[in-house]
Design a protein with these regions (language model features):
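Short terminal or interdomain "cap/linker" segment that borders an active site or interface and mediates
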Residues: 184, 219-239
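Basic, Lys/Arg-rich alpha-helical nucleic-acid-recognition elements, primarily the DNA-binding modules
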Residues: 1-98
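Short beta-strand micro-motifs in enzyme catalytic cores
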Residues: 92-96, 181, 230-234
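Short, charged/polar, Gly/Pro-enriched secondary-structure boundary elements
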Residues: 101-106, 190-194, 239
Length: 239
C-alpha cells in the first residue's frame, strides 16, 4: 500500500470519549512521570527499571504502568532479561513501550493531519510531473475516496450522507433557513492553517468537499464557496 492510500480518515473510530480518557489518564502525576520515563528510554522498560527510575515502590509502578496499557498509551511486550532460553530460563518479564499512535483531542475539532496528507500528496504528484491544479484535484479526490471507504455512509438522502461524513471530520454542519435550503459548515477543521494561508488551504478544502460530494453522487445538494467568517469557506446549498 502506498502512502497515498494511507490518508487518514482520522481517529474517530476510537471515539472522542476514549481519546479524552487517554489524555485524562496522564492527570495523575505518578502516571504522567512513568509515561515520560518510558517514552525517553531507548528500549522497552521493566517494572523494576521504572520503579527505580522514579524511586517509587515496584507495586506502585506496576499498577500505573498497567493502567497506561489499559488506556492505550503504552504497549506491553514479554522478554527474558537473562538472555537464556529453555527450561530453567525463568518467566519472561513484562516490559513497556510507548505506543506509536498519537492521541489528539482538540476543541473545536481540528484535522491538520488530513490537510497535511492532502498537501503532501499534492507535492508528490507535482514532483512526478503532474500540473499543479491537476495534482490538487487528484490529491483531494484520493483523500475523499479513502475517507468514504473508511466511513461508508448509510443515510438515504444526499444531505444526510454528506453532512454525516463532514460531521465526523469536524465541520459541524448546521441547517440554515428552511428545510432543504442549505447547510452551514460552522467549523473549519484547518482553522490555523486557513488563517495563515487562506490562498492555499481554502482552495484545497473546497476541492476536498467537492470530491466528497462527487463520490457520494450528491444531486440534491452541492458545495458552494462562501465568506467563511468564523466557520468554513464552503456551504452546502440545495437545488
Amino acid at each position: 500500500m502506498s502512502r497515498r492510500d494511507q490518508t487518514p480518515a482520522g481517529d474517530e473510530f476510537d471515539g472522542f470519549a476514549q481519546r479524552v480518557s487517554r489524555v485524562s489518564a496522564l492527570a495523575d502525576p505518578i502516571r504522567r512521570a512513568l509515561y515520560h520515563f518510558v517514552a525517553h528510554q531507548p528500549g522497552a522498560v521493566s517494572r523494576d527499571q521504572a520503579a527505580a527510575g522514579l524511586e517509587i515502590p515496584r507495586h506502585t509502578a506496576k499498577f500505573h504502568l498497567d493502567k497506561l496499557v489499559d488506556e492505550g498509551l503504552l504497549v506491553p511486550e514479554f522478554k527474558r532479561l537473562s538472555g537464556r532460553t529453555g527450561p530453567g530460563a525463568g518467566r519472561p518479564a513484562k516490559l513497556y513501550r510507548r505506543v506509536r499512535k498519537e492521541v489528539n483531542v482538540t476543541l473545536p475539532r481540528r484535522r491538520y493531519d488530513l490537510a497535511g496528507h492532502v498537501l503532501a500528496d499534492t507535492l508528490e504528484r507535482i514532483q512526478a510531473g503532474t500540473p499543479l491544479e491537476e495534482a490538487i484535484e487528484q490529491a483531494a479526490e484520493n483523500a475523499a475516496t479513502i475517507v468514504l471507504d473508511s466511513w461508508p455512509p448509510t443515510e438515504s438522502s444526499d444531505v444526510d450522507r454528506i453532512t454525516g461524513v463532514l460531521a465526523r471530520l469536524g465541520y459541524e454542519p448546521r441547517p440554515e433557513g428552511r428545510a432543504g435550503e442549505g447547510v452551514q459548515l460552522s467549523n473549519c477543521p484547518f482553522q490555523q492553517l486557513s488563517d495563515d494561508h487562506p490562498g492555499v488551504i481554502c482552495p484545497m478544502n473546497s476541492r476536498f468537499i467537492d470530491a466528497v460530494s462527487r463520490r457520494l453522487d450528491c444531486t440534491d445538494v452541492h458545495p458552494t464557496s462562501v465568506d467563511r467568517g468564523t466557520g468554513c469557506c464552503v456551504a452546502l446549498r440545495g437545488d
